């Protein structure tokens, strides 16, 4: 379990994207990783590195919180296309075994997607969709690169995410996560790498600015706000 942390603009997301491109990770967004226009710079960045591995992860997935909307739209569009295809086959093919086979194949594809993502995959909240997607896509012995997964989640959902990650880590999964969440960073035994001034250094959770600022605010929000807004 490795966390990449740092201020906005520190380069942690760029590094994560470069790793994703370099290891040939699959993206869960609206585009494949190699065709995502927002990741062209990551492809160039990745070419400057030599990637080595001890073993080949069966699954390599890259997921940004903002990609979930595009992914669910893609699933919804695919479900609609399959429904249209099935209707067209019923209307154009003569009755018989051939039509039964053709429509059955399309219906099976649609049923598989529905079982995984529901009849209305974009009808859930962003946070619910994000967690449901992770539960479906995190399989044993995979390598997962998550960019700010806490973004659509309430604090209790962040804890649910941590529990899910812990469960999958016990199944041989490895995670590299770029985050601003002090809750996620507190995962026991995790390696925390701080991106600062163009360098990566290992850091302790209690020394991170994210933790110190949050702790100070929670200890006395009125005093903190009075000082800030004076």
Where are these regions (language model features)?
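ATP-binding Walker
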Residues: 9-10
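Walker B catalytic acidic pair
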Residues: 147-149
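Phosphate-coordinating catalytic segments in nucleotide- and nucleic-acid-processing enzymes
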Residues: 2, 13-144, 155, 203-230
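Residues at the beta-strand->loop junction immediately N-terminal to the Walker
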Residues: 4-6
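C-terminal lobe/lid and adjacent interdomain/linker elements of RecA-like ASCE P-loop ATPase modules
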Residues: 156-174, 181-230
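Beta-strand elements within well-structured catalytic alpha/beta cores of enzymes
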Residues: 15, 176-177
């Amino acid at each position: 379990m490795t966390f990449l942390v740092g201020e906005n603009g520190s380069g942690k997301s760029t590094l994560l994207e470069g790793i994703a491109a370099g290891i040939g990770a699959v993206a869960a967004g609206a585009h494949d990783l190699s065709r995502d226009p927002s990741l062209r710079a990551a492809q160039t960045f990745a070419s400057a590195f030599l990637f080595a591995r001890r073993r080949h992860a069966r699954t390599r997935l890259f997921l940004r919180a903002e990609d979930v909307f595009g992914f669910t739209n893609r699933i919804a569009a695919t479900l609609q296309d399959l429904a249209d295809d099935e209707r067209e086959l019923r209307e154009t093919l003569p009755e018989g075994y051939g039509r039964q086979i053709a429509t059955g194949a399309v219906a099976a594809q649609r049923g598989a997607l529905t079982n995984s993502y529901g009849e209305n995959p974009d009808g859930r909240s962003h946070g619910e969709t994000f967690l449901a997607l992770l539960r479906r896509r995190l399989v044993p012995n995979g390598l997962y690169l998550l960019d700010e997964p806490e973004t659509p989640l309430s604090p209790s959902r962040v804890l649910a995410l941590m529990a899910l990650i812990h469960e999958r880590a016990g199944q041989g999964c490895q995670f590299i996560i770029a985050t601003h969440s002090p809750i996620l960073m507190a995962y026991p035994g995790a390696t925390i790498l701080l991106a600062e001034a163009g360098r990566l250094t290992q850091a302790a959770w209690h020394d991170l600015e994210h933790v110190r600022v949050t702790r100070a605010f929670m200890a006395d929000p009125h005093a903190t706000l009075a000082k800030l807004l004076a």
